[in-house]
A protein has these predicted regions:
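A generic secondary-structure signal for well-formed alpha-helical elements
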Residues: 45-48, 52, 117-124, 149-156, ...
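Active-site cores that bind ATP or allylic diphosphates and position pyrophosphate for catalysis
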Residues: 118, 122-286
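N-terminal Rossmann-like or analogous alpha/beta NTP/dinucleotide-binding catalytic cores
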Residues: 1-153, 248-249, 255
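Short, histidine-centered active-site or binding-site loop motifs used for metal coordination
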Residues: 21-26, 230, 305, 460
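Catalytic adenosine-cofactor/nucleotide-binding cores of aminoacyl-tRNA synthetases and other
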Residues: 240-245, 266-421, 497-524
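Basic, alpha-helical terminal appendages of large translation-related enzymes
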Residues: 1-15, 29-30, 56-58, 153, ...
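Short amphipathic alpha-helical segments and their helix-coil junctions
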Residues: 124, 228-229, 285, 346-365, ...
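A short glycine/serine-rich beta->alpha loop
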Residues: 24-32, 231-237, 476-481
Length: 524
């Protein structure tokens, strides 16, 4: 059984209605690492629907969280906003300076991320956390937290193993400068929390408004209770023993809520580097990734891996292998058979679940996502055909396409061209057809190979110009020359590409002009 289906089955024991949640702090540009949580939750939501449950998928934005430091992409003038909730900070302009006309900091970084989510079929119900504070939904939770201050203090210390300061208070009010930093609580008289800030200014915050917030461990537990959350996958930092998940469960119960099922996911790492981090510069933005990775492939990267296994995200050579795996699954989906062992049945369900959950829409036909053309073949065509119409004409000639290309195939070609023209495309997969045989390539071709190439050049003049016929002509010419297929292919790669490897040789040759190819092959 796929991990998302297993989660849905487990959640069904709680009841017929589920609220599956994920969240994010909009402190900077998002990266693909964030999609582990987003897609894990969204796939569980879909699995719940497929299981016959009612389910909402909610995306909670931590817009009440403060700016913690001045990031590299911000100007030093943001120093004055440290400690201020992200919803209350102006967005940065192109020069990194605060832009009063640019909306809020939180919205500035959230908007492109939500657009990216749409492209991969994720359209959640969005809740801005500062609005939940502002409309008073947190008020009862805040009052309960303050009233039960000692109990919560004990939970956090006993579960996390860390000691809280003597003046710890389960609510952080905003000071006179709008910052959460350096503010000390002096009293509570519902609905007001009284305080004195670092400038010595005294004031009070109304818990019915967004004039302060609960500390993270209590805030998380409170929102579970407020929104009736039944499932919220969390990263291994929050899910570790003594982490915020473990403290959140008893705190949520204390606040009158029913805590969600604990589900923990591993992080995504950029291949050859550490976990993705916006602040450390180890990042691929979601818009950048989606400009080069087909959405189904991106979803498949998440869907095929259990939540507790880390993922190495690779936009280089590994993309071909991932696409190959996905295309094999779509072209020949496994089916259960009576004679199968239990282990094989589980494998079949897992793979079919991964294929199902990789689609942009729940009702999509997986074969439509491939568009009848393999990722590798499209890569070759995108490099040797300068315009899209030439690609479509080629696909019609080869039988891959009849009529006009479907939207998914057009999108795939667009992304392929972006990938090829960018920094992520693997050097070893680049194709440049040689107009003449270079000296280095010529020096690697022995007499037996020359004889094969001479014979092949003559036979290419009369063979049908399609992949199958050219492939058979290459093999028969190699056999008649006493040359093995591998050596024959290497010879052709050297002549055509100037190196000893490349895409499927018959596919490549079929895309070339007959006279030009014969001229290069016979010139050896």
């Amino acid at each position: 059984m796929h991990w998302a289906d297993f989660a849905a089955q487990k959640l069904s024991e709680r009841g017929e209605t589920q609220v599956v949640v994920s969240g994010i702090t909009p402190s900077g540009e998002f990266h693909i690492g964030h999609l582990r949580e987003i897609l894990s939750a969204e796939m569980i939501h879909r699995a719940c629907l497929d299981f016959g449950l009612e389910s909402r998928y909610v995306f909670i934005v931590d817009s009440m969280d403060p700016l913690r430091r001045v990031y590299d992409f911000l100007s030093p003038s943001y120093e004055s906003y440290i400690g201020v909730p992200l919803a209350n900070i102006p967005a940065p302009g192109e020069d990194g300076e605060p832009d009063p006309e640019g909306g809020s900091y939180a919205e500035f970084f959230l908007r492109p991320f939500l657009e990216a989510l749409k492209q991969i079929g994720v359209e959640p119900e969005v809740i801005m956390n500062h609005e939940t504070y502002q409309n008073g939904e947190f008020a009862e939770m805040i009052d309960l937290a303050i009233t039960n201050r000692d109990e919560i203090h004990g939970i956090i210390e006993s579960v996390s193993g860390r000691e809280l300061p003597e003046d710890w208070f389960p609510y952080s009010p905003l000071g006179s400068n709008g910052s959460l930093d350096g503010v000390k609580v002096t009293g509570y008289d519902r609905p007001f929390v009284h305080w004195i800030d670092g400038q010595g200014i005294e004031g009070k915050s109304d818990i019915r408004l967004a004039e302060g917030k609960l500390p993270w461990r209590i805030d998380w537990a409170a929102r579970w209770a407020i929104h009736g959350v039944t499932c919220e996958p969390a990263g291994k930092d929050h899910g570790a023993a003594g982490g915020s998940y473990d403290t959140g469960i008893p705190i949520c119960e204390l606040l009158g809520g029913n805590p969600p099922e604990k589900m923990v996911y591993e992080w995504i790492q950029l291949k050859g580097m550490g976990p993705m981090s916006s602040s450390a510069g180890v990042t691929i933005g979601p818009m950048e990734a989606l400009s080069i990775v087909p959405p189904e492939i991106l979803r498949y990267v998440i869907a095929r891996s259990k939540m507790n296994r880390h993922i190495e995200f690779d936009t280089g050579a590994m993309m071909f292998l991932t696409a190959d795996e996905y295309e094999r699954l779509v072209s020949n989906p496994p089916n259960e058979e009576e004679a199968m062992s239990k282990r094989k049945r589980i494998s079949v369900k897992t793979r079919r679940g991964a294929m199902r959950l990789s689609q942009i829409s729940r009702d999509s036909d997986p074969s439509d996502s491939v568009g009848g053309v393999s990722f590798r073949h499209l890569s070759m065509l995108a490099q040797i055909k300068s315009d899209d119409d030439s690609v479509w004409s080629s696909l019609r000639r080869s039988g891959h396409l009849s009529g006009e290309p479907v939207t998914s195939l057009r999108s795939r070609l667009e992304k392929m061209r972006s990938w090829i023209g960018g920094d992520h495309f693997p050097e070893g997969s680049k194709i440049t057809i040689q107009s003449e045989v270079g000296e280095e390539a010529r020096s690697q071709i022995d007499e037996d190979s020359r004889s094969f190439l001479e014979l092949l050049a003559r036979r290419l003049e009369s063979c049908d110009w399609n992949e199958d016929s050219i492939g058979e002509t290459v093999r028969s010419s190699a056999s008649d020359s006493g040359l093995g297929n591998r050596q024959a292919y290497v010879s052709l790669y050297l002549v055509i590409l100037g190196r000893d490897y490349g895409p499927r040789i018959s596919s490549l040759m079929a895309e070339m002009d007959r006279e030009s190819l014969i001229g290069v092959v016979s010139s050896i």
